[in-house]
UniProtKB/Swiss-Prot annotation:
Domain MGS-like per the UniProt entry, residue ranges: 932-1069
Record HAMAP family: CPSase_L_chain_A, CPSase_L_chain_B
Protein name: Carbamoyl phosphate synthase large chain
Positions with a binding annotation for Mn(2+) 2: 298, 300
Originating organism: Clostridium botulinum (strain Eklund 17B / Type B)
Catalytic activity: hydrogencarbonate + L-glutamine + 2 ATP + H2O = carbamoyl phosphate + L-glutamate + 2 ADP + phosphate + 2 H(+)
Record: residues binding Mn(2+) 4: 835, 837
Function noted in UniProt: Large subunit of the glutamine-dependent carbamoyl phosphate synthetase (CPSase). CPSase catalyzes the formation of carbamoyl phosphate from the ammonia moiety of glutamine, carbonate, and phosphate donated by ATP, constituting the first step of 2 biosynthetic pathways, one leading to arginine and/or urea and the other to pyrimidine nucleotides.
List of residues binding Mn(2+) 1: 284, 298
Enzyme class: ligase
Keywords: Amino-acid biosynthesis, Arginine biosynthesis, ATP-binding, Ligase, Magnesium, Manganese, Metal-binding, Nucleotide-binding, Pyrimidine biosynthesis, Repeat
Molecular-function annotations in GO: ATP binding; carbamoyl-phosphate synthase (ammonia) activity; carbamoyl-phosphate synthase (glutamine-hydrolyzing) activity; metal ion binding
Amino acid sequence: MPLNKDIKKVLVVGSGPIVIGQAAEFDYSGTQACEALKSEGIEVVLINSNPATIMTDKEVADKVYLEPLTLEFIEKVIVKERPDSLLAGMGGQTGLNLAVELHDSGILEKYDVKVIGTSIESIKEGEDRELFRDMMNRIGEPVIKSEIVTDLQSGIDFANKIGYPVIVRPAYTLGGSGGGIADDEEELRIILESGLQLSTIGQVLLEKSVKGWKEIEYEVMRDSYGNCITVCNMENIDPVGIHTGDSIVVAPSQTLSDKEYQMLRTASINIINSVGIEGGCNVQFSLNPNTFEYAVIEINPRVSRSSALASKATGYPIAKLAAKIALGYGLDEIKNAVTQKTYACFEPTLDYVVVKIPKWPFDKFFGADRQLGTKMMATGEIMAIGANFEQAFLKGIRSLEIGKYSLDHKKFKEHSMSELKDLVMKPDDERIFALAEMLRRDYMIERINKITGIDKFFLEKIKWIVEEEQRLKLSKIEDLDKEWLQNLKKKGFSDKAIADMLKVSPEDIYRLRDIWSIKPSYKMVDTCGGEFEALSPYYYSTYEQYDEVEVSNRRKVIVIGSGPIRIGQGIEFDYASVHCVKALKKLDIETIIVNNNPETVSTDFDISDKLYFEPLTEEDVLNIIEKENPYGVILQFGGQTAIKLANFLKEKNIKTLGTTADQIDMAEDREKFDELLERLDISRPKGKGIWSVEEGLEEAERLGFPVLVRPSYVIGGQGMEITHDEEELIFYLTNAFVKDKKNPILIDKYLMGREIEVDAISDGENILIPGIMEHLERAGVHSGDSVTMYPSQNVCDEIKGKILEYTKKLALAIGIKGMINIQFIEFEGNLYVIEVNPRASRTVPYISKVSKVPIVDIATQVMMGAKLNDLGYGVDIYKEPELVSVKVPVFSTQKLPNVEVCLGPEMRSTGEVLGVGRNLKEALYKGFVGANMYPSKEKGKILATINKHNKAEFLPIAKDLAKVGYKFIATTGTCKLLREEGIDAEEVRKIDEEKPNILDIVKNREVDLVVNTPTKGNDSKRDGFLIRRAAVERNLGVITALDTLRAIADVELEEFDKNKDLEVFDITK
């Protein structure tokens, strides 16, 4: 049956900011869904709070509302737009939870909005642990022995009855939040308390642990007529016990017998039919490796991280088809976009192997607990495709950008066998390297299988890789013959890995390959195992059979993507890459994307003319360049990942469009940059590059503390810190020089001024600044973690003039063609430059949307030779809009045990939301609500622990908050200070005093907000850390910068009815 004619206007709910457990995959699926609906003539209204996405571009939906994802704001959009339908399954867990809340609160019924796609009843049956378990029992699908609990004591009683270990799974949460495996009652109490608080319905499933069983997933599609297919089945290399988002995953599954495969396929179809899914659904099973016993773990009745992976692994666009099914189409009525011949009811066939490896953020968090479990901690992932497992796996390892090209890891060489055993039994993000080291020392595969639950098939494959590494280490380059090299390449070894083992350069291996004509061939991802001719230009490299790439004679450009999502390099760079491709297409240039992230829009096969799903390493990128012979390569939009290739491409005489390697070096090399600033008469905070701890101490003495220290050539403020005394500086420098001895450490005088930022475009003669952005928090908080305001609110015309002057001088002197990002500090009336990035930055999507200047489009045209004066947006500073927009950071620290919450110069946020208002206070209110930072006033209490440097600044803010009804709880010093100023305050004991003390108050959630300004270098930092962690783990707001608290107080003082007076704004207008 074709299109349901009653559907005219659909509201799509996005997934909001990127957090751990809900990343770029929902930008990809949401964008696909909106485009599928529009292609059918449906009017699409989108609400999503995330400005960094392609999904929130004005071209993707007919109406776009960048508003907080709360019932109040969604109701305002419904009232204004009057959609007839709601599509909920494209916004991840956030979208599902909101759809259920909209239904249960009566809003959908009130405005006569129907849910299309999977129904609310089916969502509840899939998400509510009790309803799901009951249904499985009804249809005869096995589930693990379990109990639904809503309080602590019932959970303890059940665990005692069935025995430990038990798995805790909260209902309606994201990425396993609040869950875990408890080995005893003490652990259960901690996990259960967290799970009950984080579940939106206060419900947790406790189940007997089947840790060590295989974890298998099926991605299934079903239409409203009951047609049902499995798109892809995937096997987690890590067994049950590690969240699938933190597992290495292989598709198709490699170790299932045909009987096991068919058994689980039948079960997944049985489940999806019984729940009544209409669209896509992910089903997770645990499978006993020794018998045919299996159990259903859970389902996701929506598109998910796994469905994005399955879409990219097979070329089958799940989200697009789910949207079409929601409109009434059957699977047998929708054409396969890849073949244009077959229909969506044909199950995809894979004649290659896909490996997904998670990307974890532990490089950002010194001292983090890295142990993996049922709670997801990865920020992103890479995907690699190969003709065999070894090839895909080794491609995956080098795609992670952790400096590893093989399984040989120096760190594990010093470990004893019992230490290695511990490491593989309590897995962390580096377990695979510990495993390889055990195999290198001939530890028996059977024993490793027993202690880890990892299938012998995978262990044997890893053993083969390790043995080849050892063989290479014992050889010389003269021993490497054509056959051996060819075999190593077929199994995924990179030139660099081979060269490192043979102690020669990658160039030596490249020359041998050239002499022997060992070149990669590129195969097409075609959904049908070569059965039908495919039209998708989507390729992966192998060293196998013939090449399927047709190289054209058109003028072509290669755009290098940004790789996996990580803190400091997120979805913003994918946004820039996609817009670059779109701009090139308009210029009739053939576009080629190279990227390895399965979650993103850039790796959708119909975005570019050709997509190469490959690692972003020198060798892999060079192979594609040699194949395609492009006019040039664009690195500017792929973040630091792409920029790192600049020098290599220069050595190979490959043309980079826009900014060159020398220009990048001028901006990033401290001495060259200082010389440039001096020549241009531009100020910067005093400082220099130092090469030893002693030199650092001398420089700090000359500058005076506090000083800002950081490595050179980093992104996201990685490794950056403000140090207040010699002890802290020695600790920092000692660690920094251990990590990197080849580059200097930069040391600057720290100025606590106003931070200002611009993204500008230069054509070599003129510049265009779309907008001047001002940071709410003073310098010292990383720009990615600051609340950013546009138009700037406190920057005078004189300073704006200087910003224009300095930006123009720098862009022209460096020779920028395209994008440049500059960060300034205004301090005591003077303007200083603190950083110049000769590339697109993470603020590009935000400033593009709020200034309505298509920045990437203009920058791309400029790179291809256009002049700013001819492009219709003028030069110098673009006119400011009437509305005020604020970008508010969103953090995922709750998901990462034992990591610091406090704001500082190293970036910690994973995502962002936008607040748009008629004035700054309205915009801030929306931004804080959208980021879940606004105090709920449920209890009206603020816990304040303020260090001595901040007490004078804190008092006027506290007075204002007291005026609007907040009460304070504080330790002795802060309490005394508040009372002296006539502010009502309740005293609380410190951590080391008897209970109930300050930590108990936080743990019992007796406050709405914790304000804690950290002290450095003494014991109270430890107290502060414990308080901040306890608050974050209980979902309480934590503020560590008084500028943020000042802004909240200003919003609270504002006399507007927060429900009635706030408008919602369509940004397409």
